[in-house]
């Protein structure tokens, strides 16, 4: 597996510190700024100043009355809004019950879309947004994103729902050509109840 991409992914999931800067700032903000500065036309199809960004919940419910819990998708959403790639951040999705972390699950044992559907709740705001973009830190198969989109569409029928992940896995490739390589693809439920991501 690519050492460089592993390093970047780990830094993103811990949100810091950014490389090469003294004092170091948050990694998420650094990555989003870098993508924005380089230009990423594919992302302009998904993100924009009219989009309401909804961060995906963690694998476990937030501890009651505990503040400052690391929630990377929310930090990504805030960084995207700061760069003009979103209108506002609305945490509509919450985790009601624990699911296994995909990062620690064996291949074939990751929670599927239905497990995520059963473990999440959605809260409707006062007004219906015109379009929503779900935000995640890392996408593997896309089961969590697929479940989140289903829940949002159940509350807001007919609304446009897109998804964005800062990192997409590429399997066991020995090395990657580019760390920054935005693409637009699809995530769909397969006949076996799982999620398929292309590319």
Language-model regions, residue ranges each:
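Catalytic phosphate/metal-binding cores of nucleic-acid and nucleotide-processing enzymes, i.e., regions
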Residues: 3, 84, 88, 123, ...
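Active-site-facing substrate-recognition patch
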Residues: 1-52, 59-70, 93-129
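A structural signal for isolated positions on well-ordered beta-strands in alpha/beta enzyme cores
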Residues: 52, 133, 162-164
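Hydrophobic anchor at the start of a short beta-strand
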Residues: 87, 132, 159-161
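A phosphate-binding catalytic loop at a beta-strand-loop-alpha-helix junction
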Residues: 134-148
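Short beta-strand/turn micro-motifs composed of small residues
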Residues: 55-57, 136, 165-167
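C-terminal substrate/ligand-recognition segments
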Residues: 69-77, 83
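PRPP-dependent phosphoribosyltransferase catalytic core
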Residues: 146-199
């Amino acid at each position: 597996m690519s050492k460089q991409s592993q390093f970047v992914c780990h830094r993103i999931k811990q949100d810091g510190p950014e490389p090469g800067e003294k004092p170091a700032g948050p990694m998420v903000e650094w990555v989003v700024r870098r993508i924005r500065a380089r230009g990423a036309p594919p992302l302009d199809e998904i993100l924009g100043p009219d989009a309401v960004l909804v961060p995906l919940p963690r694998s476990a419910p937030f501890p009651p009355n505990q503040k400052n819990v690391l929630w990377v998708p929310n930090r990504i959403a805030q960084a995207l809004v700061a760069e003009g790639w979103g209108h506002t951040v609305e945490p509509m999705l919450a985790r009601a019950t624990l699911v296994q972390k995909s990062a620690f699950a064996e291949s074939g044992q990751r929670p599927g879309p239905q497990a995520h559907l059963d473990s999440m709740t959605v809260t409707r705001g006062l007004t219906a947004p015109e379009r929503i973009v779900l935000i995640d830190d890392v996408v593997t198969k896309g089961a969590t994103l697929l479940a989140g989109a289903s829940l949002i569409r159940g509350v807001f029928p007919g609304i446009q729902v897109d998804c964005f992940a800062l990192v997409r896995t590429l399997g066991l490739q020995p090395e990657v050509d580019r760390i920054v390589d935005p693409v637009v693809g699809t995530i769909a439920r397969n006949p076996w109840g799982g999620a398929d991501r292309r590319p």
